[in-house]
């Protein structure tokens, strides 16, 4: 599915023609009625795939990554394995190792708050976190450009209350011990510079519902350049 923003300066017809005449796989082209921006497009795409089209699993890969030959296979295998645990909400096979990786690390996973360059999520998890994400979308992304969203209100009125509420604890079977303290995505206190985009809200929604995101210690993809194309990997 290809999503093309609309708006006064858009050229949807030309972009659609490029897509349809290229060799890029294309199921359908969705023409937005206005300029959605990255946040609403990513939320809307997950809404379409899960809520509208009934997909059971979605893998997201940003253009900052170059997937390795076993990227998809390993992602799907890890997701299948993780379904046995009620506390795993997302899996990913990309990571930023903080030490040298050896062959014995190939099967090691760890909980992470690393950047959302890539992840895999199942519909059962999406159904639990989407209410938070949709509330964020309707309150702060409608009728305003993504760059001009009210980040102060998002942090103070939307994110902070979720930090002070008791985090849901999942029932067994659990991957992590019941006494494991999985920190909130942005530390114990929300700083003024905390991210407020849809990735941040997705991470917060996972955390408040008691989920963790796990990543293979050994990355199955490499970043373009040193720090990717358009964002910083470390939050």
Regions found by a protein language model. Give the residues of each.
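Conserved donor NDP-sugar-binding/catalytic core segment of glycosyltransferases
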Residues: 65, 70-106
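C-terminal catalytic/acceptor-binding lobe
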Residues: 142-235
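Short glycine- and hydrophobic/aromatic-rich loop-to-beta-strand nucleating segment
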Residues: 117-124
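Short beta-strand-to-loop acidic/aromatic patch adjacent to the donor-nucleotide binding site
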Residues: 54-66
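Acidic donor-binding segment of Leloir-type glycosyltransferases
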Residues: 1-30
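Active-site nucleotide-sugar/metal-binding loop of Leloir-type enzymes
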Residues: 43-57
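Short beta-strand segments
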Residues: 1-3, 92-94, 215-217
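A short, glycine-/small-residue-rich helix N-cap motif at loop->alpha-helix starts
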Residues: 33-41
